[in-house]
């Protein structure tokens, strides 16, 4: 099981803050700003200006490019109630000093204390605790499989719904 989500920066400047506000996205708060705006800077490396490219590979690997970070993230089980989350950051030998500095700065976006990854880690911990607590039980959530595919936005549950369809097939349900 695997999937790929790619977000490409539009060639025409768009007001993404307005789009988030219009959809009442909880994390969109007026008045908040980064102390270091360069954290979200980007140097174009590929033909398309890709801001996010995330490829989860079941059961425990995620290969991702967020802005200029290149990361392989592994979830390593350490027993029924523990796991280790390992981040491998990459760069290229021929990176310019500016690119290397940007990659190091943007490592603060992802990783164990990253601005983005904190929620992922917390969600994984919640699943781990629930699995240990209710290991002899099972549940079924349809995840709205009948919902139409929505591919014009990344603000969707389509990928996770499709993952669970594939997982059910893999597990013989």
Where do the PLM segments sit?
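C-terminal catalytic domain of Rieske-type non-heme iron oxygenases
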Residues: 1-173
């Amino acid at each position: 099981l695997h999937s790929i989500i790619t977000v490409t920066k539009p060639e025409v400047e768009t007001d993404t803050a307005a789009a988030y506000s219009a959809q009442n996205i909880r994390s969109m708060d007026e008045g908040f700003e980064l102390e270091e705006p360069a954290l979200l800077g980007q140097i174009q490396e590929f033909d398309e200006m890709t801001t996010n490219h995330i490829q989860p590979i079941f059961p425990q690997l995620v290969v991702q490019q967020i802005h200029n970070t290149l990361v392989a993230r592994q979830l390593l089980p350490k027993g029924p109630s523990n796991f280790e989350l390992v981040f491998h950051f990459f760069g290229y030998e021929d990176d310019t000093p500016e690119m290397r500095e940007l990659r190091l700065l943007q490592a603060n976006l992802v990783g164990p204390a990253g601005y983005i990854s904190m929620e992922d880690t917390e969600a994984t911990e919640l699943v781990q605790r629930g699995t240990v607590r209710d290991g002899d039980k099972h549940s079924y959530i349809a995840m709205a499989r009948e919902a139409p595919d929505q591919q014009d936005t990344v603000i969707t549950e389509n990928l996770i719904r499709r993952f669970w369809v594939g997982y059910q097939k893999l597990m013989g349900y």
